[in-house]
Amino acid sequence: MPHRAASPAASENEFDITNALFQNDSDSDNDTSLKQTKRPQKAAPPQALDFLGGDIDDDEDDEAFIAGQQASANRKASNLKGRTVKKGGGFQAMGLNAHLLKAITRKGFSVPTPIQRKTIPVIMDGQDVVGMARTGSGKTAAFVIPMIEKLKSHSTKVGARGLILSPSRELALQTLKVVKELGKGTDLKSVLLVGGDSLEEQFSLMAGNPDIVIATPGRFLHLKVEMNLDLSSIRYVVFDEADRLFEMGFADQLTEILYGLPANRQTLLFSATLPKSLVEFARAGLQEPTLIRLDTESKISPDLENVFFSVKSSEKEGALLHILHEVIKMPTGPTEAAQRQKEQGDGKNFKNFKKRKRGDDKAINFQESPTKYSTIVFAATKHHVDYLYSLLREAGFAVSYAYGSLDQTARKIQVQNFRAGLSNILVVTDVAARGIDIPILANVINYDFPSQPKIFVHRVGRTARAGRKGWSYSLVRDADAPYMLDLQLFLGRRLVIGREHGDQVNFAEDVVVGSLPRDGLSTSCEWVTKVLENEADIYSQRTIAGKGEKLYMRTRNSASLESAKRAKQVVSSDNWTAVHPLFNDQGSQMELEREKMLARIGGYRPQETIFEVHNRRNGKHEGDEAIDTIKRIRTTVDYKKKKREMAEKQSDFVEDASSGNKGEANETEETGAQPDEDEEDIGEGVPDNMSMASESDLEVTFSSYNGGKAKKDSAASFQNPEYFMSYTPSSTNLAEDRAYGVHTGTNANFTQASRSATMDLLGDEGARGFAEPRTMMRWDKRHKKYVSRQNDEDGSKGTHLVKGESGAKIASTFRSGRFDAWRKGKRLGRMPRVGEEETPALVHDLNTAMRRRRFQHRKEQAPKAADRLRGDYEKMKKKGEAAKQRQLSKAGGAAAGGKSELKSTDDIRLARKLKQQRREKNARPSRKK
């Protein structure tokens, strides 16, 4: 075969080997690349690919590897059996048993995901783990695989050994399914305890000595109190979706459950984010935990380009529409995937049409790959999500939505529509998007600017992955300017406002701020105004969203004081309202001047108050009382302003003096002054203790300049600088600390590692988190007094509350005596205690009781007669014939509904008596003579 040129052209059959180089791009990290287990492959046709003059054997190995990858790309591991599937891949190196490896292969897993690769070895070592992973990243298998490996088989000793707590019924069912599939080949017993199921059935399940309990916190605590369960046998505890557990108000239940667990347990906590409440819970319930998170969770991609638009509050909806229409160029109407689905649905024959199960995308052949229109919009509250969803639907876009309190099934459908391409826009809150593993996006729009820099990183981290370009667009109001400046300090990037630097801006390295073009923005705002006038539902949604925004503004975190001061100067500058450099090619110099004039008119603030204007128009003289009052107020304000300016000039003078000293030092270096002879004598290997101290050393050692108060403070200070340990950090450069705080979370010290990973998200409907202050009393209209709000929040309104073992308040209805009544009804004696051997008699009694309780359908009914006028006539006719055949083929006994021919002794005695009476009657002589 002739030599082929070494070019970046696509290989034969359009085969992409990047999948072999980078496993799972969406969750990639800085770990070492996975080692592929070599297996004998079929010999590929020899190809001369001698790029660097290597040996022919190496080239043949590469060709065989590519051929094997190409062959495996066209098959699905879950559909193959036997030795055709790769046995476990990286799972083999984790020391798992053969049954578990076979179950993993049968499940379709070939290579562990990044979160599995990081957590499973640590869990196998017996350490407590706090793992940060989104839904869809394989975290369920990350804690189920080590659990099955540790438990191995069913224990004859009484007591559950594994406990998995999930926030919802759906997630618990999903976890049970994974446990069942990976537990094949073992005799481990697993039970599901969720709300809505029968308590009596769950009593029997817990009495059957299960090994693994998968439950929701509320129902498990109910059973713990009702059955007086002893949890001392539990060795493996998992809090799945822990942040959602606290968000849903399970903090008291988790505290009570945690109190009853033994101290020698292994505790795992998996969460999408790490709020402060969860950090406190982990410190209290986990022993020296290890924080594991991926680098993609904490870094902004260098390929991400950020754009910040300065807008007014009344123009936010119009700005969003302008970005979608003019910047992203998003089309309206149904998407290509929706049209393809409709065409495939219309082309099918009705007779051969088979109903597709929800979530089965094979019939449509969707590809969860991003398009240039895939956009996610972040809003503050769920009311904003509803409002924006209705507004964008009215504009003709294909939209999906999700928020925290949305039903689990509805949220799954909405997110799946976005992943499959049935919608181009997904409107979400931070709480809802926190645990969703969304594929790589093209654009992210921050409709409401985040209150923390880490939330911004969490939002935009979903785009610009795997070497792809991505854009983020943020709408910044005047009130959001301090938060934007905090973000700029956090990222350590240059701030560019308007066109002050001309065309020399880099959206990937700078924080570039500017306004939208006035013409397009005005058109979009007019359309929004028209829609609000015509659509009463959308108008009411906007009113509700406005009320929710007021509450959101009161509860969000405050920006730093320095950023708030800087924001006043930034917002008041002319460049704040200048057209963004992104629109450089959209207008001439005349158009720019027009934009500046309109911006000045829009930002005009009169110098006179309403009192002065009113008096001047009515021709009144200056001696009026209102004018005198305004003059006195203005004089006071001017005096304070001058005093503040003098203080700023003094601080600038001090800074100039310090910078001048640095400049002199730099000049000395530049002039090439010769060093002293003593310095030349110092060898390279000897440390130079007399070298110039760094700024950080000076900052730690010496206090900063504080004007004239320094002498007074030092004289009155009681601190001995040699022995005194301050409670504040020695470094006061908060911006530098924050910037360096974004690092990988594999530190051994959980306190230090969690400090950079902690991120509090405001609830999208005011949900209370763990250990947050709350209103303890409320006004009862009926009894005309204040009553405790505790009963309203824990779902036990109108019931008594009692103290649990940990001191937390729980509903007294948890101890209702239903378990004792059930045990007496089943005629069960003393229940075995934890640590005792389970008795076969108890298992037999439980199985018998369960069989006796469950109704078994034994009655057979004849099918309905076939109707010739119905479409299922042939089907019903066959059913009837089959039922007749079953009746005729029964051997022994009567047909269904027939009378039994077996007679009892009473029946025989009665029959004999009647027969004797008939005989006596017939034996009488005839009356006729």
Swiss-Prot record:
<dbReference type="InterPro" id="IPR050079">
    <property type="entry name" value="DEAD_box_RNA_helicase"/>
</dbReference>
<dbReference type="InterPro" id="IPR014001">
    <property type="entry name" value="Helicase_ATP-bd"/>
</dbReference>
<dbReference type="GO" id="GO:0003723">
    <property type="term" value="F:RNA binding"/>
</dbReference>
<keyword id="KW-0347">Helicase</keyword>
<dbReference type="GO" id="GO:0005829">
    <property type="term" value="C:cytosol"/>
</dbReference>
<dbReference type="InterPro" id="IPR000629">
    <property type="entry name" value="RNA-helicase_DEAD-box_CS"/>
</dbReference>
<comment type="similarity">
    <text>Belongs to the DEAD box helicase family. DDX54/DBP10 subfamily.</text>
</comment>
<feature type="compositionally biased region" description="Basic and acidic residues">
    <location>
        <begin position="639"/>
        <end position="652"/>
    </location>
</feature>
<keyword id="KW-0378">Hydrolase</keyword>
<dbReference type="Pfam" id="PF08147">
    <property type="entry name" value="DBP10CT"/>
</dbReference>
<dbReference type="Pfam" id="PF00271">
    <property type="entry name" value="Helicase_C"/>
</dbReference>
<feature type="region of interest" description="Disordered">
    <location>
        <begin position="334"/>
        <end position="358"/>
    </location>
</feature>
<feature type="compositionally biased region" description="Polar residues">
    <location>
        <begin position="20"/>
        <end position="35"/>
    </location>
</feature>
<dbReference type="InterPro" id="IPR011545">
    <property type="entry name" value="DEAD/DEAH_box_helicase_dom"/>
</dbReference>
<keyword id="KW-0539">Nucleus</keyword>
<feature type="compositionally biased region" description="Basic and acidic residues">
    <location>
        <begin position="858"/>
        <end position="884"/>
    </location>
</feature>
<dbReference type="InterPro" id="IPR014014">
    <property type="entry name" value="RNA_helicase_DEAD_Q_motif"/>
</dbReference>
<dbReference type="GO" id="GO:0003724">
    <property type="term" value="F:RNA helicase activity"/>
</dbReference>
<feature type="compositionally biased region" description="Acidic residues">
    <location>
        <begin position="666"/>
        <end position="683"/>
    </location>
</feature>
<feature type="region of interest" description="Disordered">
    <location>
        <begin position="853"/>
        <end position="929"/>
    </location>
</feature>
<feature type="short sequence motif" description="DEAD box">
    <location>
        <begin position="240"/>
        <end position="243"/>
    </location>
</feature>
<dbReference type="InterPro" id="IPR033517">
    <property type="entry name" value="DDX54/DBP10_DEAD-box_helicase"/>
</dbReference>
<feature type="region of interest" description="Disordered">
    <location>
        <begin position="1"/>
        <end position="48"/>
    </location>
</feature>
<keyword id="KW-0067">ATP-binding</keyword>
<dbReference type="GO" id="GO:0005730">
    <property type="term" value="C:nucleolus"/>
</dbReference>
<feature type="domain" description="Helicase ATP-binding">
    <location>
        <begin position="120"/>
        <end position="292"/>
    </location>
</feature>
<dbReference type="InterPro" id="IPR001650">
    <property type="entry name" value="Helicase_C-like"/>
</dbReference>
<dbReference type="GO" id="GO:0005524">
    <property type="term" value="F:ATP binding"/>
</dbReference>
<protein>
    <recommendedName>
        <fullName>ATP-dependent RNA helicase dbp10</fullName>
        <ecNumber>3.6.4.13</ecNumber>
    </recommendedName>
</protein>
<dbReference type="Pfam" id="PF00270">
    <property type="entry name" value="DEAD"/>
</dbReference>
<feature type="domain" description="Helicase C-terminal">
    <location>
        <begin position="358"/>
        <end position="513"/>
    </location>
</feature>
<dbReference type="GO" id="GO:0016887">
    <property type="term" value="F:ATP hydrolysis activity"/>
</dbReference>
<dbReference type="InterPro" id="IPR012541">
    <property type="entry name" value="DBP10_C"/>
</dbReference>
<feature type="region of interest" description="Disordered">
    <location>
        <begin position="639"/>
        <end position="691"/>
    </location>
</feature>
<keyword id="KW-0694">RNA-binding</keyword>
<feature type="binding site">
    <location>
        <begin position="133"/>
        <end position="140"/>
    </location>
    <ligand>
        <name>ATP</name>
    </ligand>
</feature>
<feature type="compositionally biased region" description="Basic and acidic residues">
    <location>
        <begin position="339"/>
        <end position="349"/>
    </location>
</feature>
<feature type="compositionally biased region" description="Basic and acidic residues">
    <location>
        <begin position="900"/>
        <end position="910"/>
    </location>
</feature>
<dbReference type="InterPro" id="IPR027417">
    <property type="entry name" value="P-loop_NTPase"/>
</dbReference>
<dbReference type="GO" id="GO:0006364">
    <property type="term" value="P:rRNA processing"/>
</dbReference>
<feature type="short sequence motif" description="Q motif">
    <location>
        <begin position="89"/>
        <end position="117"/>
    </location>
</feature>
<keyword id="KW-0698">rRNA processing</keyword>
